[in-house]
Amino acid sequence: KLLAEKYTSQITSKINVSRSDVENFYKNHINDIPFFPTLYKARHILIEIKPTEETLNNTYKKSLKIKEYINNGLPFDDAAKKYSDDPGSKDVGGNLGFVSRGVFVKEFEKAAFTMEKNILSDPIKTQYGYHLIKVLDKAGDKINVKHILIQNKLSDNDKKAAYEKINNIKNEITSIEQFFIKAEEHSNDITNNLNGGLLGMIDINNYQIKEISNSIKSLKTNTISNPILT
């Protein structure tokens, strides 16, 4: 290492580059110099907009009404085409085909795999809304199943509740340490909530969530934005 440093010193001691030399080199080779974008280290706290009890009740009542229509003679397939919010199955009467365990969310799977054939379920609540399920056939560990999904339509009250929660969190943060704590306690982003909400180094010109990149652009270092809807 010492020999290498001595050899390097001998070479560089013979090099005499002035500031004007550097400036001229830059001007003459500006198109050859790669561009390195400014990167911003950013953190966030995500509060998802979730349906209130009122919204959940409205969705449940709608699914009950659809079940009533079917019990009164409306074909399941027609009900799915008219009412289902599942774009992947509604046009085929809600048919999901033969499916094994492990495909559906646990609430749907538990109901579907314990049902008798050709029985219409009560509304089954999942993260997606409420489902009406009908099992057509069983073959080994697979079932042929169809469903009608009624999604929770988020209301202005749902959005207001989420806004008030995130705004209250913001007002309680007085230091970067507090930001870390609040991210761990409240953030719904499970990819970084235990890491202080760290998003990493962001190129705001190419970041996929424009609302966030636009906010970063206008923020000073170590300041917290107002709540942003994405």
Indicate residue ranges for each PLM-predicted region.
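Peptidyl-prolyl cis-trans isomerase
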Residues: K1-T230
